[in-house]
Design a protein with these regions (language model features):
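Conserved ABC transporter NBD signature motif
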Residues: 13-20, 30
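Conserved catalytic loops of ABC-family nucleotide-binding domains
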Residues: 129, 136-151, 157-158
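Helix-to-loop junction immediately C-terminal to a conserved catalytic motif
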Residues: 5
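Catalytic Walker B motif of ABC-type/P-loop ATPase nucleotide-binding domains
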Residues: 117-121
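A short, proline-enriched helix->beta-strand linker immediately N-terminal to the Walker B motif
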Residues: 111-115
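ABC-fold ATPase nucleotide-binding domain signature/coupling loops
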Residues: 75-104, 108, 122, 167
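ABC ATPase nucleotide-binding domain helical subdomain, centered on the C-loop/LSGGQ "ABC signature"
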Residues: 16, 50-91, 135-136
Length: 167
């Protein structure tokens, strides 16, 4: 997943985005058309909830933030917080449960409606019904993205068109 996301260089072979070798692309421009969540990075940073979702992308309209919250079933829960999106995130886990953190990270990943989403085994900490809802939405043909799941979770199978097994 880290190689696919462009965070590590492959030891052999190439990673191509739309036919172009990833090594020849500017990582900032790649970040505009892909989103990812890796198991090793399942935490929020100190700042507001809004800052955690925007991740410095201040050009993204507020309406898109609201859309991402609705997509991840967080809108009502965030609105119920006394400070809403301005709620300050301190040490991860103090305010938000792991399932909330995962949905916040999914909201961050989908916020710019990227062409490619890469998820590394992230949805296992969610309540099964919520997980199914999020998976169904992520894998919907109506969305503008392709999704790659790097996982050994057999429950993903009904949601994907193609599976590649690596040994």
């Amino acid at each position: 997943a880290r190689v696919l996301a462009g965070l590590e260089t492959p030891t052999s072979g190439l990673i191509r985005y739309n036919g172009v070798d990833l090594r020849h692309l500017n990582l900032d421009s790649v970040n505009r058309f892909r989103g990812f969540i890796l198991d090793s990075q399942l935490s929020l940073f100190e700042g507001t909830l809004e800052e955690n979702i925007l991740l410095g992308r201040t050009y993204i309209p507020y309406s898109d933030v609201r859309w991402a919250l609705r997509f991840t079933e967080l809108e009502e829960e965030v609105d119920a917080l006394p400070q809403g999106l301005k709620t300050h995130v301190r040490t991860p886990g103090k305010i938000f449960a792991p399932s909330h953190i995962i949905r916040i990270l999914v909201a961050r990943a989908i916020l710019s409606r990227p062409q490619l989403l890469i998820f590394e085994g992230i949805l296992h900490n969610m309540h099964p019904a919520m997980r199914e809802t999020i998976l169904r939405r992520l894998c919907s043909k109506e969305e503008p993205w392709s999704v790659i799941f790097v996982s050994n979770d057999p429950n993903l199978t009904p949601h994907v068109d193609r599976r590649i097994l690596l040994n």
